C-alpha cells in the first residue's frame, strides 16, 4: 500500500498502530499482516534483534544474508553481496524471524500459498537479483529468445528500451541472428520513472527527455524495439 500524501499519517505509523493492538510483538505483526488488504513486508529494529516478516502471500521478497559475526535482511540480495555477505535464504509467505549478528530464529513458519509478483522479474528487479532461485537477467534474456522464436520479421537491428528492455533485446538478437544495437540511451540523473506521474503530458515529457536517440543508428534503419512491459496504455 502507498504512503498517504496529506502529511497526517504514513504507512509506518499505520502499521505500528496495528501492531500495538495486540499484547506482544509477534501477535501484533501477524495481526498487521492479516489486516492490511494488500502486500506488507517489514523489518523492525529492537534491542534484542531485527524482526523480519514477509507478506502472507509472498508477493514482495525478504532475503537474508550473512557473514562472520553479522547478518542482514533486505528486498534484493545484490544490495549486500559487495559488502562481504553471502545469501542465507529467502523468507516464505507470512514467515516471521528474528535475528542478531550470530543467529536467526523462525518465530512463525511460512505458509504454503505463494503468489509472488511476476513484475519483479519483468521490470522492478535489478538485473543481478534473483527471486525464488530465478535470475532476473536470465529470465528477461529467455523472454527475448522466446519472442524471437515466435516472430518472423524483416528488420536491420534489434534494440531494447533501456534499461529493463535491454536484456530482452539481447536474448532476441542472439536467438534470431539479427544484430543488437543501442539507438536510444537513457539519461537518468534528473528524470524519474516515466510511468509514475498521473498526467499524460508529464509522462510524455519525462519519456522524451530521458531517452536520447542516436540518430546515426536510426536513420534509414528498420528497427525492432523491445520494451519490458506496458504499464500504461
Please state what every model-predicted region is.
Residues 1-92, 98-155, 161:
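Conserved short alpha-helical segments that host acidic/polar catalytic motifs at enzyme active sites
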Residues 135-137, 200-204, 229:
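Short, flexible loop segments at the rims of nucleotide/cofactor-binding pockets, characterized by
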Residues 158-160, 165-172, 176, 180, ...:
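Extended, hydrophobic alpha-helical segments in both membrane/secreted and soluble proteins
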